[in-house]
C-alpha cells in the first residue's frame, strides 16, 4: 500500500482526521513544512488546523485534479509524490476526490479511501469560523471565488463522497485508532486520540 486517499469538503473537519493519523510511524510526513501550516482559535484555543500538502485546483499541487480521471496512473502518481522525500505510506488529500472515487478505486485498488462527512451547513459554518477566505493555507479564493460558490462546491463534494460510501459499502470508524487499524498503519501516540462522534464527524473507509 503506497497511499491513503482522503476526501472531504471544506469545513468537514477532514484536516483533523488527517492530523490525527499523520503521526503514525508508518506515515511519510516529509510533505510537512512550516509554510504548509495554518493555525486558528476556532476550537477555543489556538491550534494547528492545517498541515502538509493539499492537492487540488489552484493549490500548490494537483491543479488539474478536477480532471484526474483523464490522466494516466503514472501522471497522477508523479503529482502525488512530488512533495515527498521520505518513506512510508503517503496521505493524499483533495477536496475534489469526491468527483473521482470510482477512478481512484479502480486505479489503486489496494489503497484505502477515507471519506469525511458532515452536513453541508455544518461544513460551511465551520469553514467560515476557521477564517473562510482569510485562511492562509491552503488558499481557497482562486478556485472557490465566493461564499455562494463555496456553498455549492461543498454540496457537490459531499454528494460524491456520500454516494461512494453507499456504492462501496464503506466501513464507518469512530476514532483515529480504528481508522489507523482499518488502513493498516500503526496507531499514533495516545496524545493524538480523536473521537469522531464527539467531533461531529462521520468517517467512512472504502
Language-model-detected regions and their locations in the chain:
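PAPS-dependent sulfotransferase catalytic domain
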Residues: 85-187, 203
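PAPS-dependent sulfotransferase catalytic core
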Residues: 1-79, 181, 189, 193-206
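A generic local structural motif
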Residues: 74-82, 99-102
Amino acid at each position: 500500500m503506497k497511499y491513503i486517499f482522503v476526501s472531504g469538503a471544506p469545513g468537514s473537519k477532514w484536516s483533523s482526521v488527517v492530523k490525527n493519523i499523520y503521526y503514525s510511524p508508518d506515515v511519510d510526513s516529509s510533505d510537512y513544512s512550516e509554510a504548509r501550516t495554518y493555525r486558528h482559535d476556532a476550537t477555543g484555543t489556538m491550534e494547528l488546523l492545517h498541515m502538509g500538502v493539499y492537492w487540488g485546483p489552484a493549490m500548490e499541487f494537483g491543479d488539474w485534479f478536477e480532471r484526474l480521471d483523464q490522466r494516466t496512473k503514472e501522471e497522477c502518481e508523479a503529482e502525488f509524490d512530488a512533495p515527498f522525500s521520505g518513506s512510508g505510506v503517503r496521505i493524499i488529500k483533495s477536496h475534489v476526490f469526491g468527483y473521482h472515487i470510482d477512478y481512484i478505486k479502480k486505479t489503486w485498488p489496494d489503497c484505502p479511501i477515507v471519506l469525511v462527512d458532515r452536513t453541508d451547513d455544518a461544513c460551511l459554518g465551520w469553514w467560515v469560523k476557521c477564517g473562510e477566505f482569510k485562511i492562509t493555507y491552503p488558499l481557497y479564493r482562486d478556485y472557490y471565488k465566493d461564499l455562494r460558490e463555496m456553498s455549492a462546491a461543498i454540496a457537490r463534494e459531499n454528494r460524491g463522497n456520500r454516494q461512494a460510501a453507499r456504492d462501496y459499502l464503506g466501513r464507518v470508524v469512530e476514532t483515529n485508532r480504528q481508522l489507523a487499524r482499518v488502513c493498516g498503519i500503526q496507531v499514533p501516540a495516545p496524545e493524538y486520540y480523536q473521537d469522531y462522534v464527539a467531533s461531529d464527524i462521520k468517517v467512512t473507509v472504502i
